Amino acid sequence: MQQRSVMFRKRQISGKKGISGEEYQEMPFIRYIEKNQERTTMSEYITTYTGNHINPTNPNPALIRIEDIAHALSLLCRGNGHVKTFWSVGQHCICCAKEAMARGATARVVLACLLHDASECYMSDVPTPFKKKLPEYEIQEDRLLRMIFEKFLGSDLTKEELDLVKEIDHTMLLYDLKELLGEMTDEEMPKLHMELDYMVQPFREVEEEFLRIFTLYSRK
């Protein structure tokens, strides 16, 4: 409605004798309105690593790129940064994928483990206690993650696949709490099928390994 009003006003003014298009553009109220429109538009999207503009609440699947996911997750820290040393979401996802490999899981489950936190590169992570108070956030997060699975796996996860991904993710969480925070829970530590090493890798190496696993298992 605002844009139509501006265009109508533009025709009115520019049509008057003695008012050129250049003079119209320099009028203070026109500069203010058009600048405000630009800010409103920019506030509706984020700019990704590869230069795409994505609206996290209404994403276009065609703009979701694995390069953006791998890059962003390699730079995001687990636990909102409340860890003894830096540990990226990308490293966590790679470990989940490797645990799935070690268990002999299907290529789909390996990829799902790799991508299970992919929504965080567009929406950021929210601590679980706070997330429980934000039902709309959880709805949007679930919608975006389903879209990512459908794009890269061909379809959403089955219940059995989702249960296995959640189990592996929870197992890694328990080890993260122990190693990165020194925090133990009442749960018995589950068995790991992979060798877990919390050595921090350079961001670029994490990004490249993420992409290697994705490429390898996308072909299976």
What residue ranges belong to the model's regions?
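Charged/polar low-complexity intrinsically disordered segments
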Residues: 12-18, 22-26, 34-35
